[in-house]
Curated annotation (Swiss-Prot):
Provenance organism: Xanthomonas oryzae pv. oryzae (strain KACC10331 / KXO85)
GO cellular component labels: cytosol
Keywords: Autocatalytic cleavage, Decarboxylase, Lyase, Polyamine biosynthesis, Pyruvate, S-adenosyl-L-methionine, Schiff base, Spermidine biosynthesis, Zymogen
Name of the protein in question: S-adenosylmethionine decarboxylase proenzyme
Keyword Acyltransferase: no
Domain of life: Bacteria
EC number: 4.1.1.50
Pyruvic acid (Ser) modifications at: S113
Gene3D superfamilies (alphabetical): S-adenosylmethionine decarboxylase
């Protein structure tokens, strides 16, 4: 739960911009080129523009935002993008949320709050590794907090690795003229995660408190090879094959988690 500071009487609108950025990775091993292609097709179908639109619509509801406009696109050969413009004030009936075009007037709100997602499926050309990355941004202007959507996004996208950034920009002025650069308490993004989420992940923080920048990296603690194999079971592989695949997968996870290639 987001803990607000003592309620402020503001001079006008709350001008703070709060932005939560996610990079969520799913890692998989597919033995043959044909299996890797089927993995890409599977991911492309599971996370097409329609499904992503529903996920982001749920996010808008969770954070208490109202939908202004939705733009979505599936790409060839793979990938999808969805952008939803949101506001604090009611604009349309929720039953209309699935319509792409609401009104030309929503262009005026494009510098305000929005939720976006882009997907990036890819495969290694030789080693059988396939990954899926979802890049999600939730940016709000005013009292709405994107942190409320943390647990829903992590659970919904079944994440192996999560890289999160949260930052607060701008200021809001109270009735006495004093500027406030943040309107809620936060020491770490981890404090906003549910217990069942925290129990499953190894996490590290890199925070710059004086700049209101918070960064958390997470990866699953437990490694179950079957969870990473596509169209295959570990019991059908030889011990040597299992060890080779496990080494490849763990290396891939470590490199994505740290954001750099490890030396041989």
């Amino acid at each position: 739960m987001v803990k607000p500071l003592p309620r402020l009487r503001l001079q006008g609108f709350n001008n703070l911009t709060k932005a939560l950025s996610f990079n969520i990775y799913d890692v998989c091993y597919a033995r043959t080129e044909e299996e890797r292609q089927r993995y890409i097709e599977y991911i492309d179908e599971q996370y097409d523009a329609d499904r992503l639109t529903q996920i982001l619509t749920d996010v808008a509801e969770i954070i208490g935002a109202n939908i202004l406009n939705i733009a979505r696109q599936d790409y060839d050969p793979q990938g999808a993008s969805v952008t939803i413009l949101i506001s604090e004030e009611p604009v349309i009936d929720k039953k209309q949320a699935g319509r792409e075009l609401i009104s030309d007037a929503v262009v005026a709100h494009m510098d305000k709050s929005h939720i976006t997602v882009h997907t990036y499926p890819e495969t290694h050309p030789q080693e059988g590794i396939a990954t899926f990355r979802a890049d999600i941004d939730v940016a709000t202007c005013g009292v709405i907090s994107p942190l409320k959507a943390l647990n829903y996004l992590i659970e919904t996208l079944e994440s192996d690795i999560v890289i999160m950034d949260y930052r607060v920009r701008g200021f809001t002025r109270d009735v006495k003229g004093k500027k406030h650069y943040i309107d809620h308490k936060i020491n770490s993004i981890q404090h906003f995660l549910a217990k069942n989420v925290k129990s499953r992940y190894e996490m590290i923080d890199v925070n710059v408190y004086q700049e209101n920048i918070f960064h958390t990296k997470m990866h699953l603690k437990d490694f179950d090879l079957d969870q990473y194999l596509f169209e295959e079971r570990a019991k059908n592989l030889s011990f040597k094959e299992r060890m080779k695949i496990e080494t490849l997968l763990k290396r891939e996870i470590e490199e994505l988690f740290h954001g750099r290639n490890l030396s041989e």
